[in-house]
Amino acid sequence: MSEAYKNAGVDIEAGYEAVKRMKKHVERTKRLGVMGSLGGFGGMFDLSELSYQKPVLISGTDGVGTKLKLAFSMDKHDTIGVDAVAMCVNDVLAQGAEPLFFLDYLAVGKADPVKIEQIVQGVAEGCEQSGSALVGGETAEMPGLYTADEYDIAGFSVGVAEKDEIVTGEKIEEGHLLIGLSSSGLHSNGFSLVRKVLLDDAELDLDTTYEPFERPLGEELLEPTRIYVKPVLAAVKSGKIDGMAHVTGGGFIENIPRMLPEGLSAEIDHGSWPIPPIFSFLQEYGKLKEEDMFNVFNMGIGFVLAVKEEHLTDVIGTLESHGEKAYLIGRVKKGEGVTFGGAALS
């Protein structure tokens, strides 16, 4: 290898070792349609092997944000990859797409093969959960841009849907009901506020277990984002889903209206689902207003589906038969934005 490059902070051999370690994780994500193997200049996928008549590709890209800072502090890297996949596949899912393949971009300050393997292991886990093939990626060593212990990760998902089965929200009307799917906690949004409230201001310790939790705070915060692909796709195939929203940055306030036609609003029945204790914990320590909480966090609901009233029972039954926790959380009305129990939050 080039000693000059190594002296500049780039260890090519460590990069090769990282690729060698990740191959077994990539291998377990293979699915119908994948062509070639890891290491080519581009990942290949043969769409003709699938039974779509008028396929439309739907793509999405996202990252994990400052949740990474907690992974650095905890030296725990095996779940961040799940987050990267979840943030992307849940987005393409919101239009009714079946995720096909995924690529990751990992930028590191120093190539640590063990740490990189842990990250990619999480990516592979997320791909398995979503039925995606991990067909490629990039690991870039960037000394001087990141410290030796830092990294950033982003993901890219491509999915497919039949052209006449894409879920656009256009069919949503006044009277549609809203089904909420439970989140696992914070997912991957709002962590700049989380860190300010709990670590900077309250000076809490990530390794300490606080009431009402049964594990250290850091582990509670690093709980990976839920992936909704398999249960939601089962419901989508019924043709009874008219709109979907992935509740990410901006919480209820920003994300639910994204699926609604102009002139319609969402009325949410506050209290119709259990809110995980991490949210009240945050609200108490940060003295945060309720509107701030719903404008930043998912508040226990990570995905929302809009259905006609006559389809409610069937759709919830399908979701629950796939192990999903589904709640009737509200309805669509005339107006704009989101209201809670008839009171607008600003």
From Swiss-Prot:
It is an enzyme of class 6 (ligase). The keyword Nucleotide-binding applies. Pathway: Purine metabolism; IMP biosynthesis via de novo pathway; 5-amino-1-(5-phospho-D-ribosyl)imidazole from N(2)-formyl-N(1)-(5-phospho-D-ribosyl)glycinamide: step 2/2. Keywords: ATP-binding, Cytoplasm, Ligase, Nucleotide-binding, Purine biosynthesis. Its EC number is 6.3.3.1. It comes from the Bacteria. It is found in: Cytoplasm. Coiled coil: none annotated. Pfam families: AIRS, AIRS_C. GO terms for molecular function: ATP binding; phosphoribosylamine-glycine ligase activity; phosphoribosylformylglycinamidine cyclo-ligase activity. GO terms for biological process: 'de novo' IMP biosynthetic process; adenine biosynthetic process; purine nucleotide biosynthetic process. It catalyses: 2-formamido-N(1)-(5-O-phospho-beta-D-ribosyl)acetamidine + ATP = 5-amino-1-(5-phospho-beta-D-ribosyl)imidazole + ADP + phosphate + H(+). InterPro entries: PurM-like_C_dom (IPR010918), PurM-like_C_sf (IPR036676), PurM-like_N (IPR016188), PurM-like_N_sf (IPR036921), PurM_cligase (IPR004733). GO terms for cellular component: cytosol. Belongs to the AIR synthase family. HAMAP family: AIRS. This is Phosphoribosylformylglycinamidine cyclo-ligase.
